[in-house]
């Protein structure tokens, strides 16, 4: 067993070292946030024993086999287009980043924060770390994000979506657009660290898969499984933080619009969980909970259930994928 004190400096030093020496790694960081279902504070998995990289066709079955091999612990991502493996759908929008639809790896090493230390069974933390000086990691190129969709195209899309709502075939929409920077050289670890300082959210992540990265700072728990218990905590309802936190929370809680959006997704999640849960076990544990984060207050509801016997965890994910707070409702028009 190897360990060093879990200072922020040691964590950042380790991430930089791993980024320099390995093609695959995944950092999971709660930023010290704890709730009743928290089980992990900080974890870095890296090195490559096996890799799964594929398009959406039969992706979930591939993932089941990948997980079951030696009962391996695996890390990775499921892209939005895996919806095409859950329903008879197709994708009209071409990806601008060309990430695999599913990308997972089994790591050689795992470092976890435990009782104030960074701990690893196999990786010698003290002997392998090396400091990267600040002048090597901070870059400030004069580049700006550009939207993929023009303003006029965006307005036309909104008109179309409004008509769908008016016609009644969609009743809640989460519309997303992309922004890009081309020919942008940067230090990804430095960008993640800046994001972490600005927005330290409980489900933050830095994933490297060959020469591609995902940087994430999310407050939302899609799914968690503890024993036979399934937990989903969709977010719908947001308000900016001001100096008067109590007034902020009351305004969000009493917003008819935000409550309507939230309860729609609660019903959608309950319906998704029916596919993978024992009959009669689905419960709304908390409705319209107000949670405070660095920049925002969020309305979060908690839905729990008991998983069906002998059901693979990947089947649970497939039953609920994509998450309702991302798709809107209904998922399929």
Where are these regions (language model features)?
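Extended alpha-helical targeting/anchoring segments
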Residues: 1-333
